[in-house]
């Protein structure tokens, strides 16, 4: 007897052979223990992409996670070229006023050039 497509692939109700061959997800055993009623599990799909920045090859075929500092250095512009020390501006005190003013790099250079005072 031939089955029509509507009978064979009834989307409204699962067929008995489908129901018997695949147990429901909430009854499947889980590696972490049994699940209670109403709990669902989900797994994230993971790719083996070599462009991932969250892990590196450990040299023995396995993977290891990168330290947070290393990840941050990769994301910063200019790479991990070196450490920044000090500030761009300097605080100086004038003899007359006694107040502090910040000078930028350009102002310091202009002060050192002859004929600019």
Swiss-Prot record:
It holds the Pfam family Dehydrin. Residues 13-23, 98-117 have a biased composition (Basic and acidic residues). InterPro entries: Dehydrin (IPR000167), Dehydrin_CS (IPR030513). Induction: By desiccation (leaves) and by abscisic acid (ABA) (leaves and callus). Residues 1-117 are annotated as: Disordered. Residues 85-97 have a biased composition (Low complexity). Keywords: Stress response. One of its GO terms (cellular component) is cytosol. One of its GO terms (biological process) is cellular response to salt. Belongs to the plant dehydrin family. This is Desiccation-related protein clone PCC27-04. It comes from Craterostigma plantagineum (Blue gem).
């Amino acid at each position: 007897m031939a089955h029509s497509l509507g009978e064979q692939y009834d989307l409204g109700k699962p067929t008995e052979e489908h129901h018997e061959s695949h147990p429901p997800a909430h009854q499947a055993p889980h590696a972490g223990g049994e699940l209670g009623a109403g709990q669902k599990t989900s797994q994230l799909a993971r790719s083996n992409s070599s462009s991932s920045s969250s892990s590196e090859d450990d040299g023995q075929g396995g993977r290891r996670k990168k330290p947070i500092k290393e990840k941050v250095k990769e994301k910063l512009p200019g790479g991990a070229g070196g450490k920044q020390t000090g500030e761009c501006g300097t605080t100086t005190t004038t003899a007359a006023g006694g107040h502090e003013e910040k000078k930028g790099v350009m102002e310091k250079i202009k002060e050192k050039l002859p004929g600019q005072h």
